[in-house]
Design a protein with these regions (language model features):
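Charge-rich, low-complexity N-terminal segments
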Residues: 1-79
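A generic local secondary-structure boundary/capping motif
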Residues: 15-16, 25-26, 121-123, 132-133
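Short acidic-glycine loop/turn motifs at beta-strand connectors
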Residues: 30-33, 99-100, 136-139
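Short, well-ordered strand-loop elements centered on a beta-strand within folded domains, enriched
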Residues: 35-39, 102-109, 141-148
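A short, polar/proline- and glycine-enriched secondary-structure boundary/capping micro-motif
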Residues: 46-51, 119, 153-158
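Structured beta-strand/loop patches that form or line metal/cofactor-binding pockets in enzymes
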Residues: 78-132
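A hydrophobic, small-residue-rich beta->alpha segment in the mid-to-C-terminal subdomain
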Residues: 130-178
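Cysteine/selenocysteine-centered motifs that mediate thiol-based redox chemistry or coordinate metal-sulfur cofactors
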Residues: 170-215
Length: 215
């Protein structure tokens, strides 16, 4: 399944069958290398919160384990993001920029390979974020990110969606080797990308954004 260039799709994170977050994105390209998406600053988004209205990262994981959740809509308050999901890979790469639009680094999001869906009116890709990440600077030096959260959650195997710690770390090391070598996509590709001016920022999540996950 391929997505048409310019189409608005939803990129969703799924946790044990529940939607964790939703971000609408425009398709820049979709080919044998993978899927390239653009998330505009200020886009309408949604994220899972507990009964107190707090997101998962705002509380200890032990306190997050409650049967009461809801999806809260809001705005993407981070920088505009370029997201590349390599075909068949267990990670995605995000290009970060500063307020002036200058490239500041690559964020490697370790995740289970995305599963696509297309309902006709709306399409998307569902991933399972594995929480451990890698930050790669423009000079290709790097560091692990969110390792504390990753280790904390591994202590709750009956509730956590990551089942193979070694595989996650191995994927991270594999991508780190690519970055250190300056190989694609850490070779300067897309660092100066600018979206077409006609691509409007999604002010509302498209109908069907909360359809049941496919994974």
């Amino acid at each position: 399944m391929r997505f048409e260039v310019g189409r608005l799709v939803v990129h969703r994170n799924v946790r044990r069958g529940r939607i964790g977050w939703v971000r609408p994105a425009r398709v820049i390209s979709d080919d044998e290398r993978g899927l390239l998406l653009w998330v505009a600053e200020g886009s309408a988004v949604a994220g899972e919160v507990n009964a107190a209205g707090l997101g998962m990262r705002a509380v200890p994981f032990a306190e997050w384990l409650t049967p009461t959740f809801q999806l809260k809509q809001g705005r993407w308050n981070g920088p505009p993001l370029l997201k590349f999901l390599p075909a068949g890979a267990a990670h995605s790469v995000w290009w970060f920029r500063d307020a002036q639009g200058r490239f500041t680094g690559w964020y490697v999001n370790l995740e289970e390979t995305g599963v696509r869906w297309d309902d006709g009116g709306l399409a998307g890709i569902d991933i399972i974020d594995q929480d451990l990440d890698v930050w790669v600077r423009p000079d290709r030096s790097w560091e692990w990110k969110d390792e504390g959260e990753f280790v904390e959650r591994l202590a709750f195997p009956e509730h956590y969606w990551v089942t193979d710690e070694a595989a996650v770390r191995a994927e991270g090391k594999r991508v780190i080797a690519l970055a250190e070598a300056g190989e694609f996509p850490f070779d300067g590709t897309w660092c100066d990308f600018t979206p077409p001016p006609e691509w409007e920022t999604p002010q509302w999540l498209p109908a069907g954004w909360d359809r049941p996950p496919v994974r």
